[in-house]
């Protein structure tokens, strides 16, 4: 991971929006990927950081809250007990653990309706049964090792 991305991660962990903006925007503009690799964000409140185009690889986001934006990418990361209540997000996740996630009727992982809807996709991820049912109601795509289900 680059020194710039490390400083961005440190600013997010410190909940320091001015430092985040100072580090990010000269180097990484809106719509460009911000890639975090092997970073710890456990317990972090992302409320003031729009996370669109954030990429988390091999990261720990356990017990984080207010993860929102589109798209957000997770690969081989622990995202356990994350608080998604009131959040709107489009997530692409592969090989992650989302067990224990919190959500409510305001939580939205699909934008729009029908074939043109933007849908979150969870590939080979660990999910609680209740979360899978919640995703089914919304139309989230869940892809497992042995089958492809559009729920």
What residues fall within each predicted segment?
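Tandem repeat scaffolds
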Residues: 6-9, 14-151
């Amino acid at each position: 991971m680059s020194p710039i991305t490390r400083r961005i991660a440190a600013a997010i962990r410190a909940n320091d929006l001015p430092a985040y903006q100072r580090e990010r925007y000269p180097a990484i503009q809106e719509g460009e990927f911000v890639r975090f690799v092997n970073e710890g964000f456990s317990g972090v409140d992302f409320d003031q950081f729009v996370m669109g185009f954030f990429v988390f690889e091999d990261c720990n986001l356990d017990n984080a809250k207010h993860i929102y934006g589109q798209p957000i990418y997770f690969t081989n990361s622990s995202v356990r007990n994350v608080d998604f209540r009131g959040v709107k997000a489009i997530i692409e996740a592969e090989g992650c653990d989302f067990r224990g996630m919190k959500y409510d009727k305001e939580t939205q992982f699909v934008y729009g309706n029908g074939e043109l809807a933007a849908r979150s996709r969870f590939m080979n991820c660990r999910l609680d049964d209740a979360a899978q049912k919640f995703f089914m109601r919304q139309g989230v795509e869940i892809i497992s090792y042995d089958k492809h289900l559009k729920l």
